[in-house]
UniProtKB/Swiss-Prot annotation:
It catalyses: N(7)-methyl-GTP + H2O = N(7)-methyl-GMP + diphosphate + H(+). It comes from Neisseria meningitidis serogroup B (strain ATCC BAA-335 / MC58). Keywords: Cytoplasm, Hydrolase, Nucleotide metabolism. This is 7-methyl-GTP pyrophosphatase. Transmembrane segments: none annotated. It is found in: Cytoplasm. The active site is at 72 (proton acceptor).
Amino acid sequence: MGLELPLILGTSSVFRREQMERLGIAFQAASPDFDETPMLGESAPQTALRLAEGKARSLTGRFPEALIVGADQVAWCDGRQWGKPMNLANAQKMLMHLSGREIEFYSAIVLLNTVTGRMRRHIDKTVVVMRQLDELHILRYLEREPDAVYCSCALKSEDLGALLIERIESTDPNALIGLPVFRLVDFLKNEGVEVL
C-alpha cells in the first residue's frame, strides 16, 4: 500500500527540498500551516519533535492519503534555543556570540502514513564546535553566503559555513542541513518505498 501513496515533504525550506531531491524519489513539497511558537519549559529535542509532528499533521487535510514527512531543527547553546537570524544584523550578532562555542543541533524527522495513522519519529543530535571568529570573517562569510540568514544559527554547513566549523560529531551528516536522511530512508523502507 505504501508504494501507492504519494510522498509529501512538509516544508517551506529550499534546503530540505534540495536534500530530498538528491534521493531521486518522486515527492511533492507543501508548506505546512502550523504555529511554530516555542513553548515555555520545552527542551530543544522536545521542540524539534513537536514542530516536526505538527508540520506533518497540518497537511493531513490537504493530503488525506499520503506519506507525509515533517522535519524541524532546533539549536541549543548557552542554556537557550537558537533559531534563524532572518537578517544580516541578527546573523552577525549570533555568529559573534557563538564563536568558539559548542552548539547542539536537534534535527527531528517524522513520517506520517495518513491511511494507517502510523507516525514514525526520530531525533538526531549533532554537536558542532565553532572556530574562533572575528567580525571581518563573519562579514565576509555573510557577504558570500547571504542565504545563511535563513539557516539555524546562520550556519550553512553544506557550503561556506563549513569554514566556520572546527569539529562536528554526528551519526548522520545530512541532519545538520535539516533532514536526517539516514533515518528517513529507513522509515520509507518500512512503508514499502524503496529508495534504491
